[in-house]
């Protein structure tokens, strides 16, 4: 984890990404007393985020809890997750709209707009490699317009806030006949005047296990 804007800090550690059906777990532990962990779990119905300190959650956890569709739609983790919605788009009752092509890391990708069945404040875009159709990126965006103040002077002082979460997937290799990414990056940014924030997490995945039973309690991560 690296704080690129809005502070200073960097940490290394171990991480686990697990899924079973629509349930998803993202668990990371860092060698930092100030930020020792990030633990997010979706039990198929509710999203949980464990505080990294009493009463304190990270900006990423706060954003995801405010936008649970990231997990309930099976989007987080991409093809690393058994909940990935493109495995059963009709069952999810979601829609995809083609939005042209875009270059990512020098490669042409197909850009798709993802529209959940239930309304969401997020704009969600999925990117597939145009040559091999690997899922290489998902972007989530939300813009909050500046509120109107009680007076013109107060209105001028208000500022728009823009949130953006980018998942990037790379280093595709075969695991148990499946082609899966072995590097997973999360980048979360908040754009606001005089107080920007940019956080970066990179997961280097070294071991894959399949058909391993996981108890429901493991996905309830708020404690």
List PLM regions with ranges:
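N-terminal mature ectodomain segment of secretory-pathway/periplasmic proteins
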Residues: 1-56, 95-100
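Solvent-exposed loop/turn segments connecting transmembrane beta-strands
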Residues: 5-10, 78, 118-121
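Extracytoplasmic
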Residues: 21, 35, 91-93, 107-109, ...
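A short, surface-exposed interaction/processing loop segment used at functional sites
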Residues: 46-59, 142-147, 217-219
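Acidic/charged, solvent-exposed loop-and-adjacent secondary-structure segments enriched in E/D, K/R, S/T
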Residues: 48-81
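Short Pro/Gly-enriched beta-strand edge/turn motifs at strand-loop
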Residues: 79-83, 93-96, 107, 149-155
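A short, amphipathic edge element
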Residues: 86-98, 160-167
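Gly/Pro-enriched, hydrophobic low-complexity segments
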Residues: 101-221
